[in-house]
Each structure stands twice: as structure tokens, then as C-alpha cells.
Design a protein with these regions (language model features):
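Patatin-like phospholipase
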Residues: 1-174
Length: 174
């Protein structure tokens, strides 16, 4: 099992094995440390933050490691297209010690959209099975409303149950 994080100085995603002895869950915290909301984490001497900054949909890693097919759960609708970061000037100021991270954030929308198109191509080829919410309208990545979270979870759960035969066929290669 691996966790993805963004190494701020090298402008790249990095994957780390999950150590069972990490009693403070430092690596896990770093993998979801959103800019501005969390501090920069030091992992093995490297400043790190949210893995999604460098690799928002990390399906290529599975393919590079020998998987022939992937199941991907998207957190946004299939139609979602990421726009350039409105807060880029703030990112540049807040993370000026990490210019490569700022570059990553500047290119994040293009990288996400390219990754998304690649996933759709893999899906057409029968090499990817995608799940995506029907709607995330009114839902924010820092959502605290338990009912909204529960409703979005239930939507995903229901779709998973409805598509169970499709998942089993995909996994068996038929």
C-alpha cells in the first residue's frame, strides 16, 4: 500500500509505502494537507503537501506498476473541467520558498484535464472503470455538513451497488 504526496521542492508526485509504525499518521496527514489549510509536512527531510496537487487522479501509477486495468472513483462529475487556480497569486506569495510547487499549482488545471481525458480513453479501451458523483453542486472539499456528506456518500454507495455486476465482470476480464 502506498500514499501519494507532493514533494514541494521537486515539482513531482512521490509515492511512499505506508509504515504501520507511523503512530502519529504523519504521512497520511501530509497526503491530504491542502494548501493554506494545513502546514507543510516534513517527510524524510522533504517538505510535502497534498498529493493531489501533483497528481490529482493517480491512475498512471497503477498502470506503471503493472496493472492492466484500473477502477477509479472520481470526486467530481464526469463533466467537470478544472479551471486555472484563482488563488495563484496567493499561492505564489505563501509558498515562494517552493517555486516548483507554485509551478505545479499553476499547471494543475491542465494536468487534471489531461489526466481526465486519458482516463476517458482508457475507459473506451475497456481498461478503466469509472465512478463519478452525479452532482457535487453545493458541496465543498472542506464540507462539514454531515447530511451533505452522507447524501453524497449514499449516492456513491447506491451507484456501486447498482453496478456490482459490471465491477465483477471488469475484474474478471470479461
Amino acid at each position: 500500500e502506498e500514499k501519494l504526496k507532493t514533494a514541494l521542492k521537486v515539482n513531482a508526485p512521490e509515492y511512499f509505502p505506508v509504515e504501520r509504525r507511523d503512530d502519529r499518521f504523519k504521512l497520511l496527514q501530509a497526503t491530504c494537507a491542502l494548501p493554506f489549510l494545513f502546514p507543510v509536512f516534513d517527510i524524510q527531510g522533504k517538505p510535502c503537501m497534498d498529493g493531489g496537487a501533483a497528481d490529482a487522479i493517480p491512475h498512471d501509477r497503477a498502470l506503471e506498476r503493472g496493472c492492466e486495468r484500473v477502477i477509479v472513483v472520481l470526486t467530481r462529475e464526469r463533466s467537470y473541467v478544472r479551471r486555472p487556480e484563482k488563488l495563484q497569486p496567493l499561492i505564489d506569495a505563501a509558498y515562494r520558498k517552493y517555486p516548483r510547487f507554485c509551478d505545479t499549482m499553476r499547471r494543475r488545471a491542465d494536468a487534471y484535464n489531461t489526466s481526465r481525458e486519458r482516463l476517458f480513453q482508457l475507459e473506451r479501451e475497456g481498461r478503466a472503470l469509472l465512478f463519478a458523483p452525479h452532482s457535487t453542486e453545493g458541496f465543498h472539499r472542506t464540507e462539514k455538513d454531515v447530511e451533505k456528506i452522507r447524501a453524497l456518500w449514499k449516492d456513491g454507495y447506491d451507484e456501486g451497488m447498482e453496478r456490482l455486476d459490471e465491477v465483477q465482470a471488469f475484474l474478471s476480464g470479461s
